[in-house]
A protein has these predicted regions:
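Outer membrane beta-barrel
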Residues: 210-268, 272-305, 420-439, 589-604
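Outer-membrane beta-barrel proteins
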Residues: 197-215, 269-276, 329-332, 403-405, ...
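Exposed, low-structure sequence patches enriched in small/polar residues
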Residues: 171-175, 278-280, 334-367, 373-683
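Extended, structured, electrostatic nucleic-acid-contact surfaces
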Residues: 51-72, 88, 93-100, 115-116
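Small-residue hinge/turn detector
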Residues: 75-79, 105-106
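Bacterial Sec-dependent N-terminal signal peptides
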Residues: 1-27, 683
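N-terminal, intrinsically disordered low-complexity tails/presequences enriched in Lys/Ser/Pro
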Residues: 22-58, 121-136
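Transmembrane beta-strand segments of Gram-negative outer membrane beta-barrel proteins
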Residues: 129-166, 184, 188-194, 231, ...
Length: 683
């Protein structure tokens, strides 16, 4: 009875709270519309990239195809229509003109608004000038600190005798997370900056770290200066074709818009993230040979974290944490050198390219042999080459990539898109990744996190009907010839599907309901200790309603249910209901938001995920299981014309446990709270 009362109370709050407490960009809602639980880590990287664009938007009247392709909610057809509208009707004088573009709906317009501004239609023709760059530039500095209010086991006081027996029982540093970001920009041509980060538990100017922050990243990035299309010095990323050879960027998950799911990588790009693993360090350039042809050359030499012995690299350490003595022992223990090139042709009806990448370690990569990792990359040097292309044939688009490693093992992806009209797009994607294909920098479309040991067929649909409705869905069939981690059986298969209906009758109101299903093999141990490989089944139903009272004030309510099982064994149910309300007023310095959620899950299998508005560049996505509630308050205060203070306080309360977390992350008690503070200075 008490559970029913709490549920009714939470629903009533969701339905009645209207004018509560940050106006946050509308595009963040796109993530909630199209992503799923398993694409969160990929979305985190794209979130930082899109946040940077929204902070420094594009001039719609001089925007390019390459810039529009950075926005994943725009289809290829809609991008062409935007450019055609500007060509036919001339420069826009108001954002309201966006709805005059064929295929532009209310929801897409809201998302696009955050990335554009109305500026002059003529590009500046004056030559690049160092004097003008030093005078007319934009700079900003962000300083962030996260403060926890609960002591975790890893920060407790232990005796010298205890630490001598267990040296990794205690973190080496303070519990505060800190980062610093500096950015210099001149037009859309020159960027350079610094990113520094200290994770919670890492030492700061103490112990094994005397240099302050644990991670530093410096970059210089130039673009569109004469025939020099791009130049990156320092830390950068590279992504070409469909990512079967090289993709360090954002990988489109299966739940994303079918209209843009088969988009090529964006080549060389600046690296502004705090990711301590997924980047290159050196020099890279893209040069325009002609109006249609360009060539990219890139080189990288960097150290990496790894567990090593005298001869071999046993595991690559990718989490970036250096909080324990065991972490310090793995820090910068190996180096990797990489060289690559890409030749690309961009025509009116055809695009294609040739990519080749060679990289080597200073030691032999040889992970401890397990049945499932028999075909993982092994060796000291690796070479991959590939050919990719895209052909536009009226309402059809054919695309694909073929890649090979130095032993001749193949990876292939093919796609066919059909758009009978501006409102409908159907896409079919087939993939074949040999179980022995090896590429350290590949990140292709599929179910596996590795681009190997997978065959699959995907079909996706996106269509609008009855003016205000949008239907999205997909089915993906996949097959794994070899064993996988936690799957001790060959020749397993599975099915992944999603169906979503959205309703957006006006600029102010959007709602959608989404159903997701996944059936995937996984190891399972019966109570009798018998070990089997059984289908792991997950159902997810999510409903959400967004209502914007104006540009500054918005209410979001949502409800979600989860059901999981292992082929009629160990059934687990979970749900959440909650709201987010945002407020602000034009010209008023204070803006904010509040999020409240009630959740109840049987165990970890039916865990739920929650996105919260946070400080700039901080991706706030959390997972919860058990029974409890979550409250978060976010405030944005403009101190002066050039200084903004952001703060986020969060509190989680559990009803069915006396401790939170485990190991060094364990907190005694039922409550957990923390505070994020960030100061932004721009000039």
């Amino acid at each position: 009875m008490l559970r029913k009362y709490r549920l009714m109370l939470c629903i009533s709050i969701c339905c009645t709270v209207v004018n509560v407490v940050h106006s946050q960009s509308s595009w963040v809602e796109w993530k909630e519309v199209v992503t799923d639980d398993e694409t969160i880590s990929e979305w985190q990287e794209k979130y930082q990239e899109l946040t940077e664009i929204s902070e420094h938007p594009f001039n719609i009247n001089t925007i390019t195809k390459e810039q529009l392709e950075q926005l994943p909610f725009l289809s290829d057809r809609l991008i062409e229509n935007i450019l055609y509208y500007l060509y036919k009707y001339g420069p826009m004088v108001s954002k309201n003109e966006l709805l005059g573009i064929e295929g532009m709906d209310y929801q897409t317009r809201r998302f696009l608004n955050d990335f554009i501004y109305i500026g002059p239609s003529q590009k500046e023709t004056r030559k690049f000038s160092l004097k003008r760059m030093l005078k007319y530039n934009q700079q900003d500095l962000l300083i962030r600190v996260d403060i926890p209010f609960n002591e975790k086991a890893g920060y407790a006081d232990y005796s010298e005798e205890t630490l001598k027996k267990s040296p990794n029982k205690k973190y080496l540093g303070s519990p505060y997370y800190q980062n610093l970001r500096y950015r210099f920009q001149y037009k859309k041509q020159v960027y350079w900056g610094l990113v520094a980060e200290k994770d919670a538990g890492e030492p700061f100017f103490t112990g094994p770290n005397k240099k302050g922050y644990d991670f530093y990243s410096v970059y210089l990035y130039l673009q569109d200066i004469g025939r020099l299309k791009k130049l990156a010095v320092g830390n950068y990323r590279a992504a070409f074709g469909y990512g079967l050879v090289m993709n360090m960027g954002f990988s489109m998950g299966k739940a994303y818009s079918s209209a843009s799911i088969n988009r090529f990588g964006n080549g060389i790009s600046k690296f502004t993230s705090t990711d301590e693993f997924n980047y290159l360090r050196g020099v890279a350039a893209t040069y325009r040979l002609t109006d249609r042809w360009d060539i990219s050359l890139f080189h990288s030499f960097r150290t990496m974290d790894a567990r090593v012995d005298n001869r071999f690299i046993k595991t690559l350490k990718t989490d970036g944490y250096h909080r324990l003595n065991s972490d310090i022992e793995k820090k910068n223990t190996i180096n990797n050198q990489l060289v690559g090139s890409n030749l690309n042709y961009n025509g009116k009806y055809v695009e294609y390219g040739f990519i080749a990448v060679y990289n080597c370690f200073n030691k032999v990569l040889n992970p401890d042999l397990r049945p499932y990792n028999k075909f993982y990359p092994r060796g000291r040097s690796f070479f991959n080459g590939g050919v990719y292309g895209k052909w536009f044939l009226k309402k059809f688009t054919l695309a694909g990539e073929i890649a090979s490693d130095k032993k001749g093992k193949m990876a292939v992806v093919q796609s066919l898109s059909y758009s009978p009209d501006m409102k409908t797009n159907i896409v079919l994607i087939n993939r074949y990744y040999d179980k022995k294909y090896q590429s350290l920098y590949a990140n292709g479309f599929g179910e596996n996190s590795r681009t190997q040991n997978e065959l699959g067929s995907y079909i996706g649909l996106e269509t609008s009907f009855l003016k205000s409705f949008k239907l999205m869905g997909y089915l993906d069939f996949f097959y794994f010839p070899w064993l996988r981690y936690r799957v001790d059986k060959r020749n397993t298969m599975g099915l992944d599907g999603m169906l979503q209906v959205g309703y957006s009758p006006s600029y102010s109101l959007q709602m959608f309901i989404k159903y997701g299903y996944k059936n995937k093999a996984q190891n399972y141990t019966l109570p009798s200790k018998t070990k089997l490989v059984l289908p792991s089944i997950r159902h997810r139903l999510h409903y959400q309603l967004n209502y914007a009272f104006n540009e500054q004030t918005m209410l979001k309510t949502f409800a979600e249910g989860i059901f999981t099982s292992h082929w009629k064994q160990d059934k687990s149910i979970g749900y959440q209901v909650g709201l987010t309300a945002k407020w602000g007023r034009e010209g008023f310095p204070l803006k904010g938001s509040i999020t409240g959620v009630w959740f109840d899950t049987d165990n970890y299998d039916s865990r739920i995920y929650l996105y919260e508005p946070g400080v700039l560049y901080a991706f706030s996505m959390y997972s919860y299981y058990g029974k409890g509630s979550r409250l978060a308050l976010n405030v944005n205060y403009k101190l002066t014309r050039w200084m903004i203070l952001q703060a986020k306080w969060g509190w989680t309360h559990y009803l069915n446990r006396d401790k939170i977390g485990s190991g060094r992350e364990e907190i005694l008690g039922r409550d957990k709270s923390d505070l994020q503070l960030q100061l932004k200075i721009k000039w």
